[in-house]
């Protein structure tokens, strides 16, 4: 009798994706983040579902419903903080996953890479709308500031903003629709993840050397399943340490004050994972220019396959490109720090220089260094 695992229409798909999948024998721990992102998504959907059972998306009761979850619901505090800090873990894994793709040249898989960038946008949109839901001061003002950026779009801007708000300011209609979108988007993300994997399995995984590994494959199970389980345990350990010891470490104290349209917080800033983009937005004095730079700071990832000038795929054997890559990482840390600082000297100029450096490295320096390395190797 043939194995049901290999014949059953549904189980067969799972088998080809997670069990009998031929995988390169040398993929490192940097390849763990795909599975970790899957676990993060599952954690977020499950905790979010239980939060939605007790949350009310009305301006009068939203804040107190979150308080009710934390105080009166069995383990409600745990679910709420797992969801809030789960988002932070999600973004840590996302940034490392994208960074791995950039370092090892995984972006040469066009479809997989582009769907990954779309996924990044979708996750950022979901996180932004989720941050609005507790209806604290930073929720309200964050929503006001970020949605207002759309008014920079010529001709249709103002109409578009009022259409998104459902009125003339961020109010009940805005909160209700943000809750609806925040609920549906993770399921759209799950569908996109499946397409992401579909395209990945068309080509097979990349590996640290960037060389074709068809002659040296091993089965995904048991080798990489056990490796993924180790990663998952470490992820859960990190998440639960954060949740149980310092759940508010990454949050903003202003969000423990109920939303008040008449009182603006002294420093409006998003969650830490948006600060690098926020710093780029603020570094341009022009509103439309800032919005364009903000969008391009993520959209530029789609240009990497076009800007790849090296004859080698990975940066593993390219020390000059490696050096530039780590300068780019340091620059992103600088932008993240600047995004959380007030708009005053010297932070303004540091932010502007870091923003210029970010785009210059990606568009000019990395391709130029790649061409230089080709010359050094007489290619």
Swiss-Prot record:
GO biological process: mitochondrial electron transport, ubiquinol to cytochrome c
Cofactor: heme b
Residues annotated for heme b b566 binding in this entry: 97, 196
Transmembrane spans: 33-53, 77-98, 113-133, 178-198, 226-246, 288-308, 320-340, 347-367
A GO term, aspect molecular function: metal ion binding
Subcellular location: Mitochondrion inner membrane
InterPro entries: Cyt_b/b6_C, Cyt_b/b6_C_sf, Cyt_b/b6_N, Cytb/b6-like_sf, Cytochrome_b, Cytochrome_b_C_euk/bac, Cytochrome_b_N_euk/bac, Di-haem_cyt_TM
Positions contributing to heme b b562 binding: 83, 182
Binding site for a ubiquinone: 201
Keywords: Electron transport, Heme, Iron, Membrane, Metal-binding, Mitochondrion, Mitochondrion inner membrane, Respiratory chain, Transmembrane, Transmembrane helix, Transport, Ubiquinone
Topology class, membrane: Multi-pass membrane protein
Co-factor note (free text): Binds 2 heme b groups non-covalently.
CC per GO annotation: mitochondrial inner membrane; respiratory chain complex III
SUPFAM superfamilies (UniProt xref): a domain/subunit of cytochrome bc1 complex (Ubiquinol-cytochrome c reductase), Transmembrane di-heme cytochromes
Further information: Heme 1 (or BL or b562) is low-potential and absorbs at about 562 nm, and heme 2 (or BH or b566) is high-potential and absorbs at about 566 nm.
Subunit note: The cytochrome bc1 complex contains 11 subunits: 3 respiratory subunits (MT-CYB, CYC1 and UQCRFS1), 2 core proteins (UQCRC1 and UQCRC2) and 6 low-molecular weight proteins (UQCRH/QCR6, UQCRB/QCR7, UQCRQ/QCR8, UQCR10/QCR9, UQCR11/QCR10 and a cleavage product of UQCRFS1). This cytochrome bc1 complex then forms a dimer.
Cited function: Component of the ubiquinol-cytochrome c reductase complex (complex III or cytochrome b-c1 complex) that is part of the mitochondrial respiratory chain. The b-c1 complex mediates electron transfer from ubiquinol to cytochrome c. Contributes to the generation of a proton gradient across the mitochondrial membrane that is then used for ATP synthesis.
Family as reported in the entry's similarity comment: Belongs to the cytochrome b family.
Protein name: Cytochrome b
Recorded name of the encoding gene: MT-CYB
